[in-house]
Amino acid sequence: MAAHPLQRLTSPSRSVSLLLHVLGLASFSYNFHFLTVWETPLSVSYGWHFQFLTIIGLTASLIAFALGVLADLTLSHALFQAKNAVAVLATPLEVVISILYWGIRFIDPNLLIADGFVLDMLPDMGFHLAPAVFLTLDLILLSPPWTIPAYTIMAISTVIAFAYWYWVELCFSHNGWYPYPLFELLSTEQRVLLFTFSAGLVTVSSSCLKWVYARVNGYQAAQKEAHKPLKKVQ
């Protein structure tokens, strides 16, 4: 199958593409294995570790790279398209998760991490940095340019943000505590602002990733592709 002319490397393929996707899939799978042996109150709580946006993002990353591995092994264009469709949202989401996590942690780790939930550096990097790195490399090196417009990303991100808020409140109604201590400090109005702001960040992240892609792979051509919002993500 011929790669998109703006792709830096051939994908799907059984060479570099397969190597990157296998490494990413192994990293994400290890993170989930870690959760199954990490004994905390979350392990027996309602919602398990899926109360954390980090784990929801990690799930999307795992799905994208599993599809990527299958596409590389079978050279399937359909699986390659499916991987790209998941990655279009998973990649900017993971970038935002990394920025918010490390930024807030630098300011005050107690806003994110309750007592007894402190991670060692290696798993911490695995959850809060590796997914963003792997997915960004997949985009820049192994994917065609995104053609999804910013308003679509904003709409989808807003729906996901408020669906996550509903999910967090549902878990709180069963468990009596929030996954992030920060939520305890916010009023309802402040939470609305937080989740709206987060959806906006995902949109900005998507636009920035498109800009980086254009700079690396061909600015003018990528800009023309970005103005074809109805074109399928290949």
Which positions does each model-derived feature cover?
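Membrane-interface loop-to-helix entry segments
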Residues: 121-133, 193-196
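Alpha-helical transmembrane segments in multipass membrane proteins, preferentially the mid-helix core
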Residues: 131-148
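Juxtamembrane non-transmembrane "cap" segments at the membrane-aqueous interface
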Residues: 159-177
